[in-house]
């Protein structure tokens, strides 16, 4: 490709509304342009990267035995009503009616459509297992689209759905998809972790997220510094302290704390170690509970894990924190003065809190706290559960090493759905025993557009994008200096351009009448891995300057050797 016949569209300045580096660089490198909130046009450079990501995904899905299909973006509402998600999904589901007043949705996902297809096409266990995939546009009416294509309303996604007659068969496909995803992200040169995850609104049993590690990530990823253990912070188990609870050394005393309504204020005003404090959070109780509220206690320096808490049988789902009015109606004290002593509602304490002694907590009287509280002496030990977020330095749940926490961008997610959708839509086949059998499902997604942004978040420097070779828009940039004034520069540039293309190498030759500084800046901004610079001065010695984008290293290579050198560097 020649720049004179190409839409380069690079920008010198960073657009003011671009918050994260991937959004900034995708705009500056001429990869995307915003059409409306959460909607982007992909320009040629961006589309080349997107297609490379898509091709890697397609190759590995085919290698794993999945079958490609294509389903409509527009879906009839009756399928969503049948599955029960018409009301559950909320405002992110874009609903509309056609000219016949029939309701439809723009598909944010395709569980209903594929299940409808399978229930009409399959009749016998002999046809299973099958795993269908597509690479298709999705639309989710995000309330706050942000970060460019990282969280856009319209996006490209690879979604796959497998169908089985047994859990064992589902597990085999799930493991195959796990391995395929690992190959996909490894081939793209990404630093990622496959982490245990909560199944969320999709439902089902087992679930893993594939997270690209990046500072701009929205998720906290927990992993061991020694083993392969990795989990989303919502799911990571906080191991109970291994040391026995220390013996009491203080008497419980009631202390006036009128200006200490938070743990931070209590610690500062009374010079308490924060790890000797306990915070009490009140949430709505489950419907069958005798009490309207439940008290959840975590150590002062720990955070409540809302996903873990919501799964407790005593707690209402979705997790709902009590208002001050609701708290005072039951406890007769405000949120800043709550604690376990004389608490009139059920109490659940974190494992770490159960191991504490001589600690401070609210007295359930406004403006007062108890100091020196000890379990079983001052208050009976309540129900104990893992209800906190892990912190860096906690022991790994698998017993190997300690935990590290980094930010991650979710680029893939695999689920064992079980029978959630097949039961709702009555998708069944005749089983081996001749009886009707509801199908067991798995689903497997990759955010193709998000992968592009995530790759940039891991691969950039002060000059622009530094693409991994496998997904770079071009493999080689040819920069002929003053080619319109130097015949030998032009002749050699054209010769190398033809020879490299004949070797199957993707080349962008900058044949614009631009200053060298502009040409260098654009190629580095775009992030092409290999650059060769052809100039009269080096040609006097039969040399060409070669530069590798990632390391920045430069070297002089003889003109007769440069093609072989590049072919070897790119193809190995």
Swiss-Prot record:
InterPro entries recorded: aa-tRNA-synt_IIb, aa-tRNA-synth_II, aa-tRNA-synth_II/BPL/LPL, Anticodon-bd, Anticodon-bd_dom_sf, Pro-tRNA-ligase_IIa, Pro-tRNA-synth_IIa_bac-type, Pro-tRNA-Synthase_IIa_type1
Enzyme Commission number, as recorded: 6.1.1.15
Protein name (record): Proline--tRNA ligase
Domain characteristics, as noted in the entry: Consists of three domains: the N-terminal catalytic domain, the editing domain and the C-terminal anticodon-binding domain.
GO molecular function, one term: aminoacyl-tRNA deacylase activity
Catalytic class of the enzyme: ligase
A GO-annotated cellular component: cytosol
Gene3D superfamilies: Anticodon-binding domain, Bira Bifunctional Protein, Domain 2, YbaK/aminoacyl-tRNA synthetase-associated domain
Originating species: Salmonella schwarzengrund (strain CVM19633)
PROSITE patterns, A to Z: AA_TRNA_LIGASE_II (PS50862)
PANTHER family assigned to the protein according to its UniProt record, in alphabetical order: MITOCHONDRIAL RIBOSOME PROTEIN L39/PROLYL-TRNA LIGASE FAMILY MEMBER, PROLINE--TRNA LIGASE
Subcellular location as annotated: Cytoplasm
SUPFAM superfamilies: Class II aaRS ABD-related, Class II aaRS and biotin synthetases, YbaK/ProRS associated domain
Key words of the record: Aminoacyl-tRNA synthetase, ATP-binding, Cytoplasm, Ligase, Nucleotide-binding, Protein biosynthesis
Coiled coil: none
Pfam families: HGTP_anticodon, tRNA-synt_2b, tRNA_edit
Catalysed reaction equations from the record: tRNA(Pro) + L-proline + ATP = L-prolyl-tRNA(Pro) + AMP + diphosphate
GO biological process, one term: prolyl-tRNA aminoacylation
Function: Catalyzes the attachment of proline to tRNA(Pro) in a two-step reaction: proline is first activated by ATP to form Pro-AMP and then transferred to the acceptor end of tRNA(Pro). As ProRS can inadvertently accommodate and process non-cognate amino acids such as alanine and cysteine, to avoid such errors it has two additional distinct editing activities against alanine. One activity is designated as 'pretransfer' editing and involves the tRNA(Pro)-independent hydrolysis of activated Ala-AMP.
Family in the record: Belongs to the class-II aminoacyl-tRNA synthetase family. ProS type 1 subfamily.
Source organism superkingdom: Bacteria
Subunit relationships: Homodimer.
């Amino acid at each position: 490709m020649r720049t004179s016949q190409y839409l380069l569209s690079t920008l010198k300045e960073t657009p003011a509304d671009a918050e994260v580096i991937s959004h900034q660089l995708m705009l500056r490198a001429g990869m995307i342009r915003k059409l409306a909130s959460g909607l982007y046009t992909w320009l040629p450079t961006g589309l080349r990267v997107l297609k490379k990501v898509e091709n890697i995904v397609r190759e590995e899905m085919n290698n794993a035995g999945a079958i490609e299909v294509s389903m409509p973006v527009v879906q009839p509402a009756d399928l969503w009503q049948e599955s029960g998600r018409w009301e559950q999904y909320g405002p992110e589901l874009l609903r509309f009616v056609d000219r016949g007043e029939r309701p439809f949705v723009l598909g944010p996902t395709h569980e209903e459509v594929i299940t409808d297809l399978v229930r009409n096409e399959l009749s016998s266990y002999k046809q299973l297992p099958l795993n269908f995939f597509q690479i298709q546009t999705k639309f989710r009416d995000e309330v706050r689209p942000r970060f460019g294509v990282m969280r856009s309303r319209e996006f490209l996604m690879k979604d796959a759905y497998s169908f089985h007659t047994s859990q064992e068969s589902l597990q085999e496909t799930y493991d195959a998809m796990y391995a395929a995803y690992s190959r996909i992200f490894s081939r793209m040169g990404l630093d990622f972790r496959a982490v245990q995850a909560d199944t969320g609104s999709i439902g089902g049993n087992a679930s893993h997220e594939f997270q690209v590690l990046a500072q701009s990530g929205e998720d906290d990823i927990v992993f061991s510094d020694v083993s392969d253990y990795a989990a989303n912070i919502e799911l990571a188990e906080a191991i109970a302290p291994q040391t026995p609870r220390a013996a009491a050394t203080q008497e419980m005393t009631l202390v006036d704390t009128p200006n200490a309504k938070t743990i931070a204020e209590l610690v500062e005003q009374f010079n308490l170690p924060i790890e000797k404090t306990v915070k009490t959070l009140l949430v709505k109780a489950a419907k069958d509970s005798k009490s309207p509220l439940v008290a959840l206690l975590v150590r002062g320096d720990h955070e409540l894990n809302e996903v873990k808490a919501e799964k407790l049988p005593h707690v209402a789902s979705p997790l709902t924190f009590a208002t001050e009015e609701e708290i005072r109606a039951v406890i007769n004290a405000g949120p800043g003065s709550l604690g376990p002593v004389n608490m009139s509602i059920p109490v659940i304490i974190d494992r770490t809190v159960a191991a504490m002694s001589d600690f401070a907590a609210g007295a359930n009287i406004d403006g007062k706290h108890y100091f020196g509280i000890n379990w079983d002496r001052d208050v009976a030990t309540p129900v104990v559960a893992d209800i906190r977020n892990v912190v860096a330095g906690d022991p790994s749940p698998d017993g190997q090493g300690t935990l590290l926490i980094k930010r991650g961008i979710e680029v893939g997610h695999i689920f064992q759905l079980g029978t959630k959708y097949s039961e709702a839509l009555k998708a069944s086949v005749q089983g081996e025993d001749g009886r009707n059998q509801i199908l067991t499902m798995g689903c497997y997604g990759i955010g193709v557009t998000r992968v592009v942004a995530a790759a940039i978040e891991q691969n950039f420097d002060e000059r622009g994008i530094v693409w991994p070779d496998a997904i770079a828009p071009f493999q080689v940039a040819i920069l002929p200096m003053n080619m319109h004034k130097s015949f030998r520069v032009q002749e050699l540039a054209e010769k190398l351009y033809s020879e490299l293309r004949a070797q199957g190498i993707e080349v962008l030759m900058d044949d614009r009448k631009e200053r060298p500084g502009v040409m260098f800046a654009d190629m580095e901004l775009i992030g092409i891995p290999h650059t060769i610079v052809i100039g009269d001065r080096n040609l006097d010695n039969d040399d060409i300057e070669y530069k590798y984008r990632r390391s920045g290293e430069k070297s002089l290579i003889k003109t007769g050797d440069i093609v072989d050198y590049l072919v070897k560097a790119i193809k190995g």
